[in-house]
Amino acid sequence: MIGKYLSWFMLAFLFGFVLESYRVQSQDLNPTEKEVLSNMLDFLQRHSRTTYMFPLLSESKRNSELINSLLGAPRVLNNAGR
């Protein structure tokens, strides 16, 4: 059991080290590479265990955007019917 957690920790540490070294060179990235890296980090953030225990601010922002779009929907539909 401990070996499983240790292997996950080592994998996360190695991945973090690689990302940190990649971040240092981020000035040399083209927009496509930045988008791929952003998508990969977003995926890891959504699927990591800590996001279930401690929700991040980005999730609340997404929720507020959803609420704002739903509250604005009747106005848009009303304007479209005119």
UniProtKB/Swiss-Prot annotation:
Domain of life where this protein originates: Eukaryota
Q: Name one GO cellular component term.
A: extracellular region
Signal sequence span is 1-26
Where does this one sit in the cell? Secreted
Q: Which UniProt keywords apply?
A: Amidation, Cleavage on pair of basic residues, Hormone, Neurotransmitter, Secreted, Signal
Tissue expression notes: Expressed strongly in the head and weakly in the ventral nerve cord. Not detected in the midgut cecum or hindgut. In the cephalic neural complex, specifically localized to cells within the optic lobe, anteromedian protocerebrum, accessory lobe, tritocerebrum, and subesophageal ganglion.
Sites bearing Alanine amide, chain numbering: 80
The UniProt similarity line reads:
Belongs to the arthropod PDH family.
Tell me the protein's name: Pigment-dispersing hormone peptides
Organism of derivation? Armadillidium vulgare (Pillbug)
